[in-house]
Amino acid sequence: MSQRTRLSVNVNKIAVLRNSRGDGAPDVIRAASACIDAGAHGITVHPRPDARHIRHDDVIGLSALTRARGVEFNIEGNPFAEPRAGYCGLLALCRETRPHQVTLVPDGDQQITSDHGFDFAREGPGLRPLIDEIKQWGCRVSLFVDVNVTGLADAAIWGVDRIELYTGPYAEMHHAGCSDAVLREFATTARLAQDVGLGVNAGHDLSQTNLGVFLGAVPDVLEVSIGHALISEALYEGLVPTVRRYLDILDSVNPAVSMR
């Protein structure tokens, strides 16, 4: 079975807008449903300990929505962030909702957004038991990584299913008009991951402007997770048309990749 690269829409920014007024508008569940109506293959959230955007009730509602609509639910987050008032912790959220995919990300509590991947040599011993636990719940496990990451074979041994390439450096170089060299590095990292049996996802600062070039250069990307750019573009173009524009890019660049 094969299919094109999948689009998972990150709805964090919808929650940011809602929380800015302290009421229920815009409705995160309704926005996610509109993305699914437009053809999105999945929904992504990255709940943080300070509940600056996605909250516990959002995760529960989105889990129910994605299961009812037959699309994937991807929960991102730092598994080492301690539970606290209003935040039960990433593992507790995943245990409760059993998402299709859990993407582990090494972000600090005060970071505005994710900006680096895991160091397998340093953080691997702490990750291994968490990966085992998440896999027991029937969830696919993906690790957020930098281009040129080392230790991919170790990650495969730990039971990791996929990596998510942190594409921020590519987006920056693309904006500057000099992305060829970094694209070659991303392509090499993707191939190395695939050679040891890992699937490859990608995300961070991908947009309508740079997505096609990235997918044209980096082989067999299974999923892209896009939030900030997509929601920003949707302010001008509308949410449903914007999602469809991304799907058009996926169709035109990489119509079929083997699923892992």
UniProtKB/Swiss-Prot annotation:
Biological pathway: Cofactor biosynthesis; pyridoxine 5'-phosphate biosynthesis; pyridoxine 5'-phosphate from D-erythrose 4-phosphate: step 5/5
Site, as annotated: Transition state stabilizer: 164
GO BP annotations listed: pyridoxine biosynthetic process
GO MF: pyridoxine 5'-phosphate synthase activity
Catalytic activity field: 3-amino-2-oxopropyl phosphate + 1-deoxy-D-xylulose 5-phosphate = pyridoxine 5'-phosphate + phosphate + 2 H2O + H(+)
Residues annotated for 1-deoxy-D-xylulose 5-phosphate binding in this entry: 48, 53, 113
Compartmental location: Cytoplasm
Complex formation: Homooctamer; tetramer of dimers.
Protein task: Catalyzes the complicated ring closure reaction between the two acyclic compounds 1-deoxy-D-xylulose-5-phosphate (DXP) and 3-amino-2-oxopropyl phosphate (1-amino-acetone-3-phosphate or AAP) to form pyridoxine 5'-phosphate (PNP) and inorganic phosphate.
Protein name: Pyridoxine 5'-phosphate synthase
Organism: Xylella fastidiosa (strain 9a5c)
Gene name per UniProt: pdxJ
